[in-house]
Amino acid sequence: MDQKQIEEIVRSVMASMGQTAPAPSEAKCTTTTCAAPVTSESCALDLGSAEAKAWIGVENPHRADVLTELRRSTVARVCTGRAGPRPRTQALLRFLADHSRSKDTVLKEVPEEWGKAQGLLEVRSEISDKNLYLTRPDMGRRLCAEAVEALKAQCVANPDVQVVISDGLSTDAITVNYEEILPPLMAGLKQAGLKVGTPFFVRYGRVKIEDQIGEILGAKVVILLVGERPGLGQSESLSCYAVYSPRMATTVEADRTCISNIHQGGTPPVEAAAVIVDLAKRMLEQKASGINMTR
C-alpha cells in the first residue's frame, strides 16, 4: 500500500464521518525549528521542551546552516557536541530526562477514572499489579475469570470486528492517542457495513490475550490497540495487532498483522484508523491475516 492509497482511504473514512481529512504530511517525523545554532547551556531550560530538542551543542561550527538543517530534519540525537571525550552536560541531562520519561510510562498505571470517562468496560488479565506484569508476561496473555464472565455478559457476541484497547508497556500511548484513533476507527468499521463488537479496555494485557478474547466472543477479526515499549524521548507510540479468527491453541505470531509507530510523530492516529479499517475489510474478504494474506 503506497502513500497515495493511504491518503485515499483517509479521505474516504473522514468523509463518511462528515469531517475533512488532514493534509498529507511530507515527513513522518516531528520536526523542530531552530533559527540559529545554540551552544550555551542553561539549568533553567525545560529538558522536555521543543527548545531543548532543537538545541545544538557543536561550538564554533564551520557550517552552522548545515547543522541547523540537520537538526530540523530529525528527532534523533544529532549535533549535541562534545566536551573533550565526554558528552556535553545539556546532552547528558536530556538523555537522562528522556530515559526517565520512558521508564515512567512503563511503570505508571492508567487511572481508573480514565476508562469510566471514556465509557469503556474495563477488565484485566490474570495480572494484579505492574510488578507482576513486567515479570510474568505469560499471565498477561490470559484473562482473569471475572473478565471472562464480564465479556460474555456485556459484549456483543459473534462480531465481524472486535476492537480491544490495552495499556501494554506504555500508558501514555493509550491516554494520548485514544480520542484520535478510536472514534474514526469505529465510525469507519460501521460505515463499511461491518458488525462491530463492544470496545473495551484490558488492564495489564499482552498481545496474545486477543486470541482468548476472539475465542470467547466468536469474533472474526480482533484488533488490539496496545502501548508499545517506549524508546528514548518517545513514550506515546501505539501499535495495532490484527488477527483473523484467533484461537488460543493454534494462533501464532506470524498470523498477526502489525501496524506500529502510531503517534503524532509517526503514523498519525487518524490515518492509522483509516488503514486499519481497510485492513479489517481485506482480512474478512481473504479470511486470513499475517503472512497468510495476499498483497
Swiss-Prot record:
Catalytic activity: ethanolamine = acetaldehyde + NH4(+)
InterPro entries given in the database record: EutC, EutC_C
Key word Lyase present: yes
The record's free-text note on cofactor binding: Binds between the large and small subunits.
Binding site for adenosylcob(III)alamin: V207, E228, C258
Subcellular compartments: Bacterial microcompartment
GO biological process: amino acid metabolic process; ethanolamine catabolic process
Enzyme class: lyase
Keyword Lyase: yes
Entry cofactors: adenosylcob(III)alamin
Pathway: Amine and polyamine degradation; ethanolamine degradation
Gene3D superfamilies tied to this protein: 6.10.140.690, 6.10.250.2060, Ethanolamine ammonia-lyase light chain (EutC) (3.40.50.11240)
Transmembrane regions listed in the UniProt entry: none
Alphabetized PANTHER family for the sequence: ETHANOLAMINE AMMONIA-LYASE LIGHT CHAIN (PTHR39330), ETHANOLAMINE AMMONIA-LYASE SMALL SUBUNIT (PTHR39330:SF1)
Subunit structure: The basic unit is a heterodimer which dimerizes to form tetramers. The heterotetramers trimerize; 6 large subunits form a core ring with 6 small subunits projecting outwards.
Annotated HAMAP family: EutC
Entry protein name: Ethanolamine ammonia-lyase small subunit
Lineage of producing organism: Bacteria, Pseudomonadati, Pseudomonadota, Gammaproteobacteria, Enterobacterales
Gene responsible for this protein: eutC
